[in-house]
Amino acid sequence: MQCTSCGHDNRDTAKFCENCGRALHEPRAPAADPRTYTPKHLAERILTNRAALEGERKQVTVLFADIKNSMDLAERMDAEDWHKLLDGFFHVLNEGVHRFEGTVNQYTGDGIMALFGAPIAHEDHAQRACHAALHLRERLRVFGTQLERTRGLRFAVRMGLNSGEVVVARIGDDLRMDYTAQGHTVGLAQRVEQLAAPNSACVAQATATLVADYFELRELGAFPLKGVSEPVRVYELQGARRERSRIDVVLARSRRGFVGRRAELGLLEQALNEALAGHGQVVGVAGEPGIGKTRLCLELLRQCDARGAVFAQAHCPAHAASVALLPILELLRSLFGIRDGERVETSRRKIQRALLQLSRGFADSLPLVFDLLEIADAQQPTRMPEEQRQPALAAFLRRLVQAQSAAAPLVLFVDDLHCINPEGDALLGEIVEALGWTRTLLLVNFRPEHRSDWMQVSYYKEVAVAALPDDDADELLRCLVGEDASTDALRQLIRERTGGNPFFAEEVVQSLVDHGVLAAEAGSANPQAGAALPRAAPPLRLAQPIAELSIPPTVQALLAARLDRLAERDKLVLQAAAVIGPRFAPAVLQHILEHEPATAGARFSAEAVAEALAELGRVDFIRRDEVQGDCAFKHPLTQAVAYGSQLAASRARLHVGVARALQALHAEQLGQVAELIAHHFSAANWTFEARRWRRRAALRVTKIELGRHHRP
């Protein structure tokens, strides 16, 4: 099969070009020099997104990649051949970055700079970047091997990754535009790239901390880098951890004990009992990010072995929408016991034995299953036409569920259903239709905004998971921190700031350990910075005073990704509300959005603001006090992230807008809001106005005190 990119003749079974690494079966895009323009899809996104035009603060992972000794290569090649090599090289880079929804935002002559987490925030930006780096390493190894075989040239690429906060914005005008990131995070990623050996990828400590649970890393040491005050610890990215999914990570971290959720667990146990009795059940566990949905489901699944049930699980990663049928394939691998890295012959034997034990009638389905799991015999092509494959797979899944549940009770678990793609969701619907009168429980979890059509069946139940009550949150923090008296006030502060969200609490505690604020008592082993929380946390003590809790990057990325999924209007309204404060009056919000040139120049009608607030309430960002009429952020950290994601200039405009709105809406009682007006002018660095309104507030207090003094 000939590659449309470089013209190389490949084997018929090849999925990627053995010369340039480009995916086969894809029509080639019109030739263009990718270094001269912003990609069309990104330009459209930026031009229609006010935040992208004005700029935002985002948590991202930056990836740099370039050709090692590119000048030597260029000197040894004809200019036309060198251009052709670069064309193939950049196509490989683009494919690898876009595969994991990254953005190639700069071409550096012989390499690229890519962003993961901008312009669209991703909660797993560091994992995506590492997956992309490993994918590129393999594709470029093939590319380099072919170049060495045909031309005798040594071709090697090095990559560097770093994670942190950057300012992302448009540079230039609408006709010639670049979208880029600026900040210390970017420069450090480039420095780390220069430390990488040929055909390898290095990550800085910030990235390593975010991905250590999911990837194999080899520590290279701490290096003094230009522009960095302290040596930076650097790691080589070696590969993804075998048999290590998000579910495995949650399970490993859950060994500290299960806190609360007794009522919710009781509902799940009731559904399991009904399924075991032959009344198939589908249960959806719904809740906001980090609230403990997966942990609750795993607590139920611990009972499967004891109840004699066969169990299979799948996780939908955040990039699952770009991978066809991913959760369905994961369910099949889990059900048949297929392990990563095992020989394909072993996998085929496992599947054949399992299916034929259920029914000899499954013999005709073996080629389909082998093809789906990419373990078919290369000498015996079995791929059926695409228009036949989907119906055949649907029929196979229905038969499999019925046959397996007849042999033994079947429990299927799909984690993070909100990330599933339409094809996978449709096939999950086929399973749902088939399990009604079987001994099958399908357990899924998802975020509140998700809906699937198959949730209309009569045997579907939904369990809502809310924030932990204060008593349970206190118990969780005692498990994480201990009960040393020095941590009493800190534990209360963590509980208040994290709002009963278990994941947020765990990440804040780990961040405090990493920064040396919490330390083990004398004689106990100190938790390792950047590592997962210890299985049984030793009693921790307060090692240094703390005035304010910072938001861990993991939590910030998760909340920022959720904000970015909002419609633009709703996101802008939420950001404006965040400037007002954790609690805000809709009238003040309406005034600044309707009358002030705030939020990138946007103005909104009263109707538009009301609609936005209703939608933000529906998706659990805010709550409305029906008695007082005020609104409040449901979670304190959401307000902090929505506030912190805005540039200082944008926040300043909004603070001035709030101050003016308070003056307009409280013209008859200015003394009562004088201190609040002063606060907003001060936050905008309007020093003169801030002092004037503070004097007015002080004068009011003085008058009140004098009145009390002279009261008979």
Language-model features: locations:
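Catalytic NTP-binding/metal-coordinating core of nucleotidyl cyclase/transferase enzymes
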Residues: 37-40, 49-141, 179, 282
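Short secondary-structure boundary elements
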Residues: 195, 204, 229-257, 284-291, ...
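Conserved adenine-nucleotide phosphate-binding loops and their immediately adjacent elements
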Residues: 29-47, 174, 228-270, 369, ...
